[in-house]
């Protein structure tokens, strides 16, 4: 049944597609995922072990595996995050009963048994058909440890290859993405950029390429508005890296309450939309400008390898496990963010939402043998056709709202009620992605299609009665996509009648 919700007070917006300017491909890695040893992201989320009563394949939850296959996960980052700089990979190989236990000092002091290690992660990537992105331990590890890890994973012969074969894996894995440290300005060592730059150059030297495997080396980059860190690394390391990371969270404060995931007022909602829309666009634009200064040829990519919402933990959950619910507000954050990412793919190579299961803005939530799909998951599923399509630049004219700016001494953010992106697939199909963030008003969006011809197909809408609505194990289908009939083409324009707080994706072919 197609859904065309009633339109009460209706605003108007217009979009102009610049079809002739379409040339930059939307890298599928923009839709990357992040799995850290944090709370129940790995243990209970992805992994239950082969002896579990929960249906599994080689220890991986079948329900989660299928959910991730359905959104075509292109790349997965592991083992962290802050965890990466305390992780010693050799503790996570060999017979599981012989692996030493460890305390996860960063995240709640949980004691882990190391049953999920290198083999388990890389085999998971093979099952999903995605690229692994492995973060090396620079904070508490050694150059030798990092070098041997790369050799263990990718060499066909030699002492580390022999050890890998003894542990049951004859053929080396293909590992392309290597992160040299994580948040080295913070939990990864509280380093100065000058010091980390020297460490990066040293570590990457000994991460060698074996047996035809190519390494894409990523330096630990800045957080948010730290442009000096980016400038220092670009100045000192540009000849030694393929990519530079960046972290940006929709988080109100790093001290004190971050606000509830499901109980918030209108001002808090609009702050989040402005933070993920205008805020992330500003950071990407300014960080890329710094990179352009040192690398005008665009040889070095930017990787936003941590992003998403960060609210207070779910009531009753364990401190430090960062388990949070996921509402229609989070779905709107995802849509606004992805629409923005599409505009920067000339430099933006990869984005990894935090995190894949049970942590922060997750795709799925699990509890014992139950699993539910979050509103954010559905946005990722609706946006799948954009992977590897060519971004179509566009302009949007609509009403704006102003919201608080959490940066001190900064003006309030002014953000659009309507966010849009468009892309063209190899077969000529055009994807249109729209989000109406207005809490009170429907919006009639008129899109000038230019030379595009075809019919509206596969139109879907994600919306709910209340923007705080979310899926629970008791009611897992409160927020889910439905077929949408409120779009039509007339006189060279696509007209979409968007309900309030809704996300619409459709195709023209």
What is each stretch, according to the model?
Residues 249-271, 317:
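Active-site His/acidic residue clusters
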Residues 4-6:
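N-terminal signal peptide c-region/cleavage motif recognized by signal peptidases
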Residues 8-243, 277-281, 285-313, 317-509:
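Non-catalytic accessory regions flanking glycosidase/transglycosidase catalytic cores in CAZymes
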Residues 246:
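Histidine-centered catalytic micro-motifs
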């Amino acid at each position: 049944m197609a859904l065309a919700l009633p339109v009460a007070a209706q605003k108007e917006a217009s979009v102009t597609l610049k079809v002739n300017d379409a040339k930059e491909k939307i890298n599928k890695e923009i839709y990357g995922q992040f799995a850290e040893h944090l709370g129940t992201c790995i243990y209970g989320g992805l992994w239950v072990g082969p002896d579990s009563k929960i249906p599994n394949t080689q220890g991986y939850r079948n329900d989660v595996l299928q959910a991730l296959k359905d959104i075509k996960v292109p790349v997965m980052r592991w083992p962290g995050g802050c965890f990466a700089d305390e992780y010693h990979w050799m503790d996570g190989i060999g017979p599981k009963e012989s692996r030493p236990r460890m305390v996860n000092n960063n995240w709640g002091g949980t004691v882990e048994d190391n049953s999920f290690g290198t083999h388990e992660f890389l085999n998971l990537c093979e099952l999903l058909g995605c690229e692994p992105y492995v973060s090396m331990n620079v904070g508490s590890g050694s150059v030798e440890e990092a070098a041997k890890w790369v050799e263990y994973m990718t060499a066909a012969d030699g002492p580390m290859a022999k050890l890998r074969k003894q542990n049951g894996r004859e053929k080396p894995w293909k590992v392309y993405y290597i992160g040299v440290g994580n948040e080295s300005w913070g939990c990864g060592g509280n380093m100065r950029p000058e010091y980390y730059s020297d460490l990066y150059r040293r570590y990457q030297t000994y991460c060698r390429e074996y047996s035809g495997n190519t390494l894409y080396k990523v330096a630990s980059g800045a957080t948010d508005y730290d442009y000096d860190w980016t400038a220092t690394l670009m100045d000192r390391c540009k000849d030694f890296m393929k990519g530079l990371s960046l972290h940006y969270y929709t988080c109100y404060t790093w001290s004190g309450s971050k606000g509830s995931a499901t109980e918030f007022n209108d001002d808090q909602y609009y702050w989040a939309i402005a933070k993920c829309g205008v805020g992330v666009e500003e950071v990407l634009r300014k960080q890329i400008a710094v990179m352009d200064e040192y690398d005008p040829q665009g040889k070095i990519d930017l990787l936003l390898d941590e992003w998403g919402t960060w609210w207070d933990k779910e009531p009753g959950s364990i401190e430090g496990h960062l388990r949070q619910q996921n509402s229609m507000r989070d779905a709107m954050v995802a849509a606004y963010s992805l629409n923005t990412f599409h505009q920067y793919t000339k430099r933006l190579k990869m984005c990894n939402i935090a995190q894949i299961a049970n942590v922060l803005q997750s795709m799925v939530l699990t509890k014992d043998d139950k699993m539910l799909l979050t509103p954010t998951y559905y946005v990722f599923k609706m946006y799948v056709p954009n992977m590897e399509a060519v971004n179509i630049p566009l302009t949007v004219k609509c009403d704006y709202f102003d919201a608080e700016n959490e940066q001190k001494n900064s003006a309030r953010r002014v953000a659009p009620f309507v966010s849009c992106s468009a892309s063209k697939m190899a077969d000529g199909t055009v994807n249109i992605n729209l989000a109406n963030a207005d809490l009170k008003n429907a919006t009639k969006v008129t899109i000038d299609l230019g030379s595009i011809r075809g019919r509206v197909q596969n139109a879907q809408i994600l919306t709910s009665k209340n923007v705080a609505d979310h899926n629970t194990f008791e009611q897992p289908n409160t927020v889910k996509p439905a077929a949408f009939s409120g779009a039509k083409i007339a006189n060279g324009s696509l007209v979409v009648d968007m309900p309030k707080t809704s996300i619409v994706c459709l195709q023209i072919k």
